[in-house]
């Protein structure tokens, strides 16, 4: 049974963005080496060898080494690579802000998400109600 990248891919990226977001602000040489090795070995752990090979080519084309000097640099590199992969899959690119907003959305408590959804629906119902009232008023006015 082949593992569908549409299932594991988003989780894999969530994990990689978590790794980038928790990278030391100013890493020492040992940490930079450990993260470099981690990134270089990632293709080995992708469930589909062809995808691993493509990812390997991508990190050869855009090496991580210059971006391991700080957390911000590493976050930007991870975002850049994610967008490059998205482009190769005909998926839309996202800004760093969109990516981070989507990332942190996963940490919202269910109660907060439910309350936001309820408010969104209430706004839609309110707008539809106003539109119906305006249409009715226009109809009655033209009578």
Predicted segments with their positions:
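Short, flexible/disordered secondary-structure transition segments
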Residues: 27-30, 53, 92, 96
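Charge-dense polyanion-binding interfaces
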Residues: 6, 10-12, 61-93
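C-terminal single-pass membrane-anchor helix
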Residues: 116-143
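Short terminal alpha-helical segments
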Residues: 1-27
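Amphipathic alpha-helical packing elements
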Residues: 31-64
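Acidic, Ser/Thr-rich intrinsically disordered and amphipathic helical segments
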Residues: 11, 15, 34-37, 50, ...
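Juxtamembrane amphipathic/hinge helix adjacent to a transmembrane helix
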Residues: 92-116
